[in-house]
Design a protein with these regions (language model features):
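Short coil turns linking two alpha-helices in DNA-binding domains
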Residues: 37, 53-54
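Short amphipathic alpha-helical elements of helix-turn-helix/winged-helix folds
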Residues: 10, 27-32, 44
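Pre-recognition alpha-helix immediately N-terminal to the DNA-recognition helix
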Residues: 23-28, 40
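A short acidic, leucine-rich amphipathic alpha-helix
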Residues: 40-46, 57
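Non-DNA-binding regulatory cores of transcription-related proteins
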Residues: 66-139
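Short, Lys/Arg-enriched N-terminal segment that forms or immediately precedes the first helix
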Residues: 2-15
Length: 139
């Protein structure tokens, strides 16, 4: 778990004022590797932060995404979640249980894409879908 003082520094370095709510939301996303949705973050923090609204959570997460502190994952059109790990990695979503797992990328997967000459790539995300080992064993 990252120290709260370190998280506060990260917000300040990104030009974000570290209010109590912002710091709590950032700490939650960085420390929970479950790829939470905005609703999950809100449900987890609303009792701790009495004045927290769902709108505040959405706006704060957007602020973090825009600052490059958090990744927005849009694995399909209906599901949006957040990842506090901004390093290069892939995501696997189980079609059965819905769990999202981080996967290491052994090489530059963009090198496998033909025709990128002249393009400036600002972001690339690799999503894999299928059945996870746990669900596969159950069936």
């Amino acid at each position: 778990m990252i120290a709260r003082s370190e998280l506060k520094k990260e917000l300040i370095n990104a030009g974000i004022r570290p209010s109590v709510q912002r710091l709590a939301i950032y700490e939650y996303v960085k420390s929970h590797h479950t790829h939470p949705t905005a609703d999950v973050v809100y449900d987890a923090l609303r009792d701790v932060l009495g004045s927290l609204s769902l709108t505040t959570v959405y706006n704060t997460l957007k602020l973090f995404v825009d600052a490059g502190l958090v990744q927005l994952l849009t694995i399909d059109d209906t599901f949006r979640c957040f990842d506090g790990d901004t390093t290069s990695h892939a995501h696997f979503r189980c079609d059965s249980c819905g769990r999202i797992v981080d996967l290491k990328i052994k090489s530059d997967f963009l090198a496998m894409v033909d025709g990128l000459g002249g393009f400036e790539i600002k972001e690339a995300q690799l999503y894999l879908k299928g059945i996870c080992p746990i669900c596969k064993r159950k069936n």
